[in-house]
Amino acid sequence: YKIFVAEVASTSDEALLIHYLLDQSKDDKETAYLLNYFLEQFRTTLFRQTMFAEFEKIAHAKSEAGEPLTAEVLCNIYYDLNKKYFGDEIVVDKEIALEWSRIPHFYTPFYVYQYSTGFSAAIAISSKILNGEAGIVEKYKKFLSGGSSLDCIDLLKICDVDMTTKEPVEEALKVFENTL
């Protein structure tokens, strides 16, 4: 099976587990921890991995245009993206410009997007399950057993998640907002 399918499966199950643990929690500190953990998954997976993908896209475009990719150029791209993604309300330290150089994901070009898109698909599936959508558990099991039998996009359509639309990302952002 492909990494994307594995990411969707593991993240869907993790989201279901987090909701179960939140429902069972009787302790405010535990609840706060679980909520923080879940929200951090959105920040680090949906948001940050998208920023990584944009960094990659810009760097490759510059390379293909014949522009030299020096450490300074890459640091400037990365710093500017941090400013763009985090906005004016967050202080973005100059040192963040160097972070790109320690991210091993960039050794394999154009795969980080799978984390953010897989996360969106997983949140869409787990939301359907948590909301009691008719037939979704059976569809999810069929998705899980699909392995590599279909293209990832077609496998997700088994669960009525269409990654060719913005709907899964919008659902993930709605879950994030509701969790906040």
Residue ranges of model-derived segments:
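Zinc-dependent metallopeptidase catalytic helix centered on the HExxH motif
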Residues: Y1-Y20, D28-R43
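Solvent-exposed, amphipathic alpha-helical "stalk/arm" or coiled-coil-like segments used as scaffolds
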Residues: N36, E40-R48, F52, E56
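C-terminal, non-catalytic "cap/extension" segments appended to globular domains
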Residues: F4, S12-A15, D23-K29, Q49, ...
